[in-house]
Amino acid sequence: MNEASRWRHALAQQLAPHYSANPKVMAVSLGGSVSLGCADRFSDIDLMVFWTAPPTEKERREIIKRARGRRGPRLPSKAEEGYWLEQFEVAGVVIDVRHVTVETTERIPVDVLERADPSLAKQQHLAALLSALPLSNPSVLTHWQHQAATYPYELSVAMIREHLLFHPAWEQEMLAERSDLLVLYESFCTVEQHILLVLMGLNRLYYSGFRWIDRLMGQMHIIPPNLAPRFKQVFGIASIDPLAGVYQLHELVQETFVLVETHVAAVDTRQARAWFQERRKHWEYVPDRLL
């Protein structure tokens, strides 16, 4: 754990008792870059608070007050799904809190692990649990981490089928030839995200977001060679020669197809390949007998 993570961890340990003092709170944990040990000067502190019954607005507000925090902007929450988000500051340090019911926390592994639900939001919850550090009642977190530790083959197949989806190659070639760079770069991001999602399924890693992707790729064993630098090179090459950047990215797509075909026989790539390789007819001149 680096120094930026250590002092944030210490502050989180000071904040946790304000939550665990409430009898409805079963456990408190620390997540994000701090629990991973790679926080930097921009990092906030991510807390997860697990409630046996939904917290009231008053309860959450009073905890922040006891912690001498200054409440931040109202964040989107979904009470019907069993979670509430909020943000506050302590001495200028931003604290992001995800309040979640125990019922929700115990339902998500059933959906993802037993029913192979590839929902990214649910996987993100499991990824957060696996990387979390306990701040109170550690046995509860350990139990959930043990549940989430085994990534099932069926989920791997579901993830690959869901995200092995690339628009026809000619679309990016068209954007490159037109020097329509804003849309082209946006499409680069979309394709790279889909590659990563497929690779997460191949490597049986829960989706945890698209931050710290070099760290994510470092956890993968089934991966195109030199993926991290090649991802970055796509944009660098395209800034000089857009079409060359497109071809570099398309090589990665083709290599991803090969990896799926090699390691997951249950996934039929033929339809996805055919769509990616589809070509549109070009018209340099007016077609014969059209006009």
How should each PLM-predicted stretch be described?
Residues S35, V102, Y206-Y207:
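Short, solvent-exposed loop/turn segments at secondary-structure junctions
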Residues E3-A4, R66-R178:
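Conserved NTP/Mg2+-binding pocket subregion across the NTase superfamily
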Residues M1-S29:
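Helical scaffold of the NTase/Pol beta-like nucleotidyltransferase catalytic core
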